[in-house]
Structures are given as structure tokens and as C-alpha cells.
């Protein structure tokens, strides 16, 4: 009989106790005596966020198809349970078996965004695993990281035994087999890390030495041993038809951020926007066969009971069989009470026709992502979108009955001028003007245009990776320019302007491009109580400033690398 790690008393005390009990529909139960490798798969955020992540579902399904492996899930406990676990010395546990993570062979952590870095330390500490790799002994699990942030893993190098670069479907089979071989040999912990470093795509930070220039930037990074590769190449799945995909994804007990069947239609993007890390990392573009996707749609809906299905990719409009797939989903499932959720599509006649069939026009809004206010700036970032394209798409939408538009822009892009910033308000005004050119009796009420600006963060492996980042004052000054210009527009009552937190952006930029010296600052911030930094109400910028000051890092340095 499976026993819960938390008592009824604790479960009735914390918010959303279903986060911690496991045993959901399609979760995999095995006898731990029948497997050779136990793997805890972690998303370092709250359950509802982690359960929405497709990558975890793919790897969970792939691992558990092996008879010799049992993969279980673990998420960051919310702050209420975090406090109780520390007070009562309860080790963090896996959802399926409810066993402590410290008893597993591996703890795999997907690292999707920089603002979860302190949560990684929370997971390690609550699991009673030493935070620093150098302090771990043979009885501790190996801690492995994956995901987009591992393309610059250096800020986390002190906390992880190894990372995989690229798509996990290609790496883990060989890694698990290597682990079994090492375990049977009885060799020490470093022996496994040396063996793992020979696997394409595996990076073991402790096997590399880093030297620095006088100004603090990296001079050289080289392997400590001749058999350790000097360069680690990312690994990708080239044949999408052969890539594993979960026909029975785990169904959460409580509403997740994305509580639906997800069909991944393609990987990669053909666009090449110069600021976009995902577009660069996930090259080349690879598409899934439309018949395979139709088959997955049937099976996944049947196996989950979900009432919604959505498409996943970086650029869905570029999927060659999009029209056939969307038409099939509408014809097959719309009449059966299944909602069809479409990603952001290029706004053209086909897209609007499709959206009108699956959305309530009076309630839904259309999203445009011009990214920059002027054509000059859009050319600099290689957006491939003209003002005529935007106005034509908006006009088609307005004529089709829509009256709500969301516009997404970035501030602080390289070579940006004040005119580029003001162009954001001017473009929004032109879109509003286009709406009011429609005869009044054909309009759907008042036009509502929401302008949102994020602040540019130069990310590794993008053409802008070495670009300087604006300071806090500069970011806020740019937002004020846009805000003032919006208020001066003729149709200002139809325009609403929101901007992202500048302090979060500053921190994200340092963590994205930092080196191993940043690890001590992350640890210091964690010791000051920083966790859930991606959650606005939990973010404490003042504590981060204290941590950087105490560890000797200059957060305002424009060329942080």
C-alpha cells in the first residue's frame, strides 16, 4: 500500500494539497525492486506550471517505457509547504512513490528560464542533497540539467554534476546504460562523470578548468583530462517520425496552466529573428507528419478526457500542412464539445476564417508581435514584417468582427532611437484609425488595443548576444517615452499600455550571460530567502542587490558577460 509522504494534518493545512499526492490518471507506478535505475524528473516551479510542460511529459513517457527504469516527477513545493518541510525535516519526495529524492539515482532538472535558478537550490536543499557538486558523495543522486538555459550553464555549474545540450530524447538512453555499467563496476563518483563526458551532448562542468583575464572576463576554458572533449555539441532529433511522444500524458488533479492535449507540430523556426534564442537554439526546422498528428489527437483525447486541444511550435503558420490539420480538428472534434486552441498565426484570410470558427469573436482578441515600432528597427532585428502587413491583417480582422488587439514590442534593442520608441505609439494609433474607418454600423463596439513592451535581454547564441543591455534607469526612461507618446494620440482612449518589470529584466540578463562567478551570488540570494523569482509577488530585487554586493558582482555593468 502506497503511503503519502505528508500527513493528513499537513495536507489540510497547505494550499492546493493535490499538488503533492500524485497518483493522477496516466501516472506510472512500478515496483522499485523491479527496476535498476530510479530517475526523479523535476520542473523547478509549482505543480500547475510544471504539469503544463510538454518536455517533461515526453521524457517521462520515454523513460517509463524502459522496464529497467522508473521515472517519477517532482516539483517545487509552494512557500507554505516549504516552511513546514524545513520545520519538520521532511525530505522532498517524488509524486509517484512518495519516496525521498535523495534515495534516487538521478535528479533531472529542466531549466526553462533564468528566474527559476533559486528554486533549483530549493529543490536540492529540501531533497537533502548537498548544494555544491564537490560536496556530494557516492550515495547522492547525480544531478543533471537540461533545457534552453543549459546552453549557458556556467552560472549553475557549481550545483550540477552534468548537463545535456540539446533534445533529451537523443541523450538519455546512452546515459542510463552508462550509469548501469558504472554502477556494476563499483567505481567512484568521478569515474561515472568521466564516462558520461564521452557521450555526445553531455557536459560535466567539474571536468573543465576556467581561467580569467584581469578584467574578470574568461580567458580560457579547457578540459582537465585528455579524454574529455574540448567542445560539446548539441544533440537533436532529426527524424520527427521516430521521436517519442506521449499518447497517455499525465492528467493533473487540479487545473494546470495549460490543461489540454498538446500536439507538437514542428520544431525549430525558419524566421531568424536576431533577438530570439529559441529560434536559434532549436534549428533546424523539422515538421511532423500530419497523419501522425491526427492519430495522436484521437488517442490523446481518448486517454485523457481533456476538453481542449492545441498546437505547439515556434512558428505554426510555417507548418506546411496547417490548413489540412486545423480543418480536420475543427470538423472532427468541434461538434463533440472539444475546444480547439490555436497558437498565434499569421493574420491572413485563412487564419481569420479558421479563428472565427473556433473562437468567440466578441470575447477573443488577436495578437500581433511587431516587436519594434519602426520599419528600420524591424529590419535591424530581421523581423520580416512590414507595417503594411500589420495594417492589412488588422483590417481583415476588424472587418471580420474583431475589435480587440494585443500588440507586443521590445524596448532596448540594439541601435534603438527615441523615434523607434515613439513609433510604437504611432503604429498602435494607425491600427486604431484603421478600425474607425469601418462604417459604424459594421463595427463590433469600441476598439481596444493593448500595447505591451518587454525589455530586451541579449541571450547566448543569438546574433545580439554581445550587445550591451540597458540599465534600469534607461529601461524605465524608454517606457516613459512610449507612455507619454501613447497619451498624445488621437485615439488614446482606445489604447492601453503595459510594460514589464525592469528589475526582473536586469537580473535575467546577468543570469543569462553570466559565468561561474555568478553561482556565489545565486547562492547568496537564496540564503536571503529568494525563491519563486518568476512570481511577481515573491520577487525581492533588494535581496538580490544585497547578494551581488556581498559577492562582489556589479549588477549595473552594461557588458556583463
Show which residues each predicted segment covers.
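Iron-sulfur (Fe-S) cluster-binding segments and ferredoxin-like electron-carrier domains
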Residues: 276-292
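Conserved SAM/AdoMet-binding glycine-rich loop
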Residues: 41-42, 46, 115, 298-450
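N-terminal [4Fe-4S]-dependent radical SAM core
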Residues: 10-40, 47-48, 205, 211-262
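Radical SAM enzyme core and accessory elements
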Residues: 1-29, 33, 39-41, 488-561
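A glycine-rich phosphate-binding loop feature that marks nucleotide/adenosyl-phosphate handling sites
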Residues: 195-204, 314-319, 343-349, 412, ...
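Glycine-rich beta-alpha loop elements in corrinoid/cobalamin-binding modules
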Residues: 77-222, 460-515, 523-535
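N-terminal pre-triad scaffold of radical SAM enzymes
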Residues: 39-45, 63, 249-275, 301, ...
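A short beta-strand-loop structural module common to alpha/beta enzyme folds
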Residues: 67-80
Amino acid at each position: 500500500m502506497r503511503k503519502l509522504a505528508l500527513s493528513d494534518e499537513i495536507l489540510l493545512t497547505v494550499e492546493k494539497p493535490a499538488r503533492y499526492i500524485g497518483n493522477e490518471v496516466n501516472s506510472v507506478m512500478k515496483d522499485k525492486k523491479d527496476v535498476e535505475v530510479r530517475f526523479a524528473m523535476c520542473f523547478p516551479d509549482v505543480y500547475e506550471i510544471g504539469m503544463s510542460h510538454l518536455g517533461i511529459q515526453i521524457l517521462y513517457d520515454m523513460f517509463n517505457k524502459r522496464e529497467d527504469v522508473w521515472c517519477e516527477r517532482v516539483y517545487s513545493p509552494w512557500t507554505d509547504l516549504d516552511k513546514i518541510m524545513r520545520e519538520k525535516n521532511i525530505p522532498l519526495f517524488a509524486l509517484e512513490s512518495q519516496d525521498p529524492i535523495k534515495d534516487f539515482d538521478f535528479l533531472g532538472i529542466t531549466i526553462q528560464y533564468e528566474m527559476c535558478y533559486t528554486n533549483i537550490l530549493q529543490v536540492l536543499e529540501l531533497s537533502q542533497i548537498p548544494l555544491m557538486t564537490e560536496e556530494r558523495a557516492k550515495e547522492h543522486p547525480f544531478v543533471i540539467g537540461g533545457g534552453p538555459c543549459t546552453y549557458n550553464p556556467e552560472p549553475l555549474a557549481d550545483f550540477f554534476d552534468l548537463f545535456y545540450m540539446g533534445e533529451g530524447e537523443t541523450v538519455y538512453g546512452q546515459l542510463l546504460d552508462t550509469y548501469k555499467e558504472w554502477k556494476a563496476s563499483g567505481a567512484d563518483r568521478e569515474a561515472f562523470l568521466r564516462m558520461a563526458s564521452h557521450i555526445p551532448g553531455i557536459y560535466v562542468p567539474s571536468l573543465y578548468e576556467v581561467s580569467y583575464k584581469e578584467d574578470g572576463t574568461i580567458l580560457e576554458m579547457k578540459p582537465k583530462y585528455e579524454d574529455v572533449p574540448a567542445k560539446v555539441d548539441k544533440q537533436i532529433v532529426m527524424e520527427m517520425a521516430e521521436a517519442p511522444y506521449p499518447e497517455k500524458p499525465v492528467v493533473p488533479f487540479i487545473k494546470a496552466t495549460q490543461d489540454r492535449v498538446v500536439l507538437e507540430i514542428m520544431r525549430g523556426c525558419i524566421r531568424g529573428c536576431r533577438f530570439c534564442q529559441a529560434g536559434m537554439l532549436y534549428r533546424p526546422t523539422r515538421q511532423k507528419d500530419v497523419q501522425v498528428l491526427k492519430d495522436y489527437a484521437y488517442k490523446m483525447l481518448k486517454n485523457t478526457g481533456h476538453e481542449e486541444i492545441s498546437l505547439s511550435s515556434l512558428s505554426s503558420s510555417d507548418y506546411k500542412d496547417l490548413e489540412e490539420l486545423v480543418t480536420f480538428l475543427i470538423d472532427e472534434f468541434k461538434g463533440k464539445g472539444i475546444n480547439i486552441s490555436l497558437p498565434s498565426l499569421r493574420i491572413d484570410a485563412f487564419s481569420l476564417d479558421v479563428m472565427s470558427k473556433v473562437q468567440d469573436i466578441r470575447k477573443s482578441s488577436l495578437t500581433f508581435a511587431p516587436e519594434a515600432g519602426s520599419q528600420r528597427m524591424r529590419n535591424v532585428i530581421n523581423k520580416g514584417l512590414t507595417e503594411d502587413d500589420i495594417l492589412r491583417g488588422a483590417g481583415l480582422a476588424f472587418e471580420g468582427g474583431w475589435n480587440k488587439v494585443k500588440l507586443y514590442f521590445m524596448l532596448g534593442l540594439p541601435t534603438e532611437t527615441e523615434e523607434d520608441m515613439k513609433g510604437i505609439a504611432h503604429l498602435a494609433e494607425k491600427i486604431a484609425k484603421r478600425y474607425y474607418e469601418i462604417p459604424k454600423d459594421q463595427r463590433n463596439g469600441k476598439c481596444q488595443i493593448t500595447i505591451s513592451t518587454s525589455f530586451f535581454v541579449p541571450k547566448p547564441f543569438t546574433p545580439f548576444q554581445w550587445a550591451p543591455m540597458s540599465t534600469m534607469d534607461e529601461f524605465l526612461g524608454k517606457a516613459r517615452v512610449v507612455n507619454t507618446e501613447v497619451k498624445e494620440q488621437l485615439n488614446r482612449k482606445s489604447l492601453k499600455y503595459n510594460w514589464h518589470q525592469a528589475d526582473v529584466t536586469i537580473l535575467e540578463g546577468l543570469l543569462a550571460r553570466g559565468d561561474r562567478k555568478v553561482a556565489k551570488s545565486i547562492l547568496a540570494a537564496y540564503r536571503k530567502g529568494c525563491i519563486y523569482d518568476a512570481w511577481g509577488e515573491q520577487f525581492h530585487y533588494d535581496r538580490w542587490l544585497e547578494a551581488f554586493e556581498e559577492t562582489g558582482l556589479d549588477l549595473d555593468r552594461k557588458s556583463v558577460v
